[in-house]
Amino acid sequence: MNIKTLCHPEYKRISVESLLNPVEETIDCEKPHSQTKINTAKPISASLYVTTNNTAVVQHNVQKRKGVTRRCPQCAVIKTSPQWREGPDGEVTLCNACGLFYRKIFLVFGKDLAKRYFNEIKGVSVKRKVPKSLYGVTRTR
């Protein structure tokens, strides 16, 4: 589709109001443009639209993204984030930021040191940088 096709007079122009207000349209592409049937709908509720001539009822399942509200044991933040990560205890309990930091410490220093460090800084507001106290420590398995 090129710009000439989009600007062709047979195509309906879309206004800002039509984008902001929900409109139900049925267009049969096999019919010529003059025979195209357009039904505009008026919103009744968040999940139901009825056409203006009451000939058809269309159900729309509008579902908001629901997340589970959790509390990160490391930084004590409460989030409804869909992304939770594995922590030192092996469970998916850390928020995304703490989980990424734990994984970084885990890959560099091993499970034992990462778990020990996370237990030391638990509940303390700390920048998520590799601590100087762990520099020079070799990785343990």
Swiss-Prot record:
SUPFAM superfamilies: Glucocorticoid receptor-like (DNA-binding domain). The keyword Transmembrane helix does not apply. Transmembrane segments: none annotated. Keywords: DNA-binding, Metal-binding, Zinc, Zinc-finger. Gene3D superfamilies: Erythroid Transcription Factor GATA-1, subunit A. A zinc finger (GATA-type) spans 72-98. One of its GO terms (molecular function) is sequence-specific DNA binding. GO terms for biological process: regulation of transcription by RNA polymerase II. Pfam families: GATA. PANTHER family: GATA TRANSCRIPTION FACTOR (PTHR45658), PROTEIN GAT3-RELATED (PTHR45658:SF149). This is Protein GAT3. The lineage of its organism: Eukaryota, Fungi, Dikarya, Ascomycota, Saccharomycotina. The gene is GAT3.
